[in-house]
Amino acid sequence: MAPKLQAQFDAVKVLNETQSKFEMVQILDEDGNVVNEDLVPDLTDEQLVELMERMVWTRILDQRSISLNRQGRLGFYAPTAGQEASQLASQYALESEDFILPGYRDVPQIIWHGLPLTDAFLFSRGHFKGNQFPEGVNALSPQIIIGAQYIQTAGVAFGLKKRGKNAVAITYTGDGGSSQGDFYEGINFASAYKAPAIFVIQNNNYAISTPRSKQTAAETLAQKAISVGIPGIQVDGMDALAVYQATLEARERAVAGEGPTVIETLTYRYGPHTMAGDDPTRYRTSDEDAEWEKKDPLVRFRKYLEAKGLWNEDKENEVVERAKSEIKAAIKEADNTEKQTVTSLMDIMYEEMPQNLAEQYEIYKEKESK
């Protein structure tokens, strides 16, 4: 018989102490008031306005994309309204040499990282040109397999380190993605090799229709970073300043050789999971939606800038009209893009085409010429 222990190891106490360390970081409250002066980022007035312009522009893009999808002019589309601060403020903290590995809802980040809007529309339509990013756009195509981008990001970040680049790789997934095995494998590899990576979990409370409460017993998703020995932080994802500052500091750590960081942004998607038949009213209440609408990242940031005399209705209307004009031009260009063919796809696959495919190529070439 084993000897009776004289004292107990209180595992629950250790867990509670660990979880208590992950308090949500916030700089702006819902009314746009600064609640933590020490954390306010060092952004110029011009930069603050530029970030707001991008958020407004992206909200219009979301509205138009939903409309275009319903008209049959866009294919797959995952709405972004509500997540603008989480997406765009984090991207704003990056440099052009940094790599973005987006999920399927993260097209706005790569647009602002240099991807032409027309190409984003072509990606939605399944046109191969939508995956041929222009030279200098350091990003990969949006990942459809949930969580897979975390492994890829670890590899890209490790490659940047091996090449001595002063750059980072950043990726995004949702709360549901943090339950995937690829999530752990990615952050563990990056941790082990101190790869310059930033792993963003955009916690919008639902993995499609599965609520956050049924996905994990962890009090926060940021604390999952502890398992691989790297920092994790939870921020108010509706607060552009908090998201920006958290990402900026994570980037500084990464390029200094201190390894990756996990950032959990508490956010919300106002629309459906995707435009492929999801109905959020079946799993969300109108009261819940109303509570999160009070936290709208655009409203909050708008109030902050108005109080500083940097924003007004005329300025916003100007951005809205510019967005509509640019979106109209981009979708027209996408409409006029030459229809893809089997041979045009094969042309970009091989430098020297294998004999068996070369024979098939000639067959399709003849068919397409008729």
Swiss-Prot record:
Catalyzed reactions: N(6)-[(R)-lipoyl]-L-lysyl-[protein] + pyruvate + H(+) = N(6)-[(R)-S(8)-acetyldihydrolipoyl]-L-lysyl-[protein] + CO2
Enzyme Commission number(s) of this protein: 1.2.4.1
GO MF term set: pyruvate dehydrogenase (acetyl-transferring) activity
Pfam families cross-referenced by the UniProt entry: E1_dh (PF00676)
Assigned keywords, A-Z: Oxidoreductase, Pyruvate, Thiamine pyrophosphate
Keyword Oxidoreductase among UniProt keywords: yes
CDD domains: TPP_E1_PDC_ADC_BCADC
Cofactor: thiamine diphosphate
GO biological process: branched-chain amino acid catabolic process
InterPro entries per the UniProt record, alphabetical: Alpha-ketoacid_DH_E1_comp, DH_E1, PdhA/BkdA, THDP-binding
Record's function text: The pyruvate dehydrogenase complex catalyzes the overall conversion of pyruvate to acetyl-CoA and CO(2). It contains multiple copies of three enzymatic components: pyruvate dehydrogenase (E1), dihydrolipoamide acetyltransferase (E2) and lipoamide dehydrogenase (E3).
Subunit structure: Heterodimer of an alpha and a beta chain.
Protein name: Pyruvate dehydrogenase E1 component subunit alpha
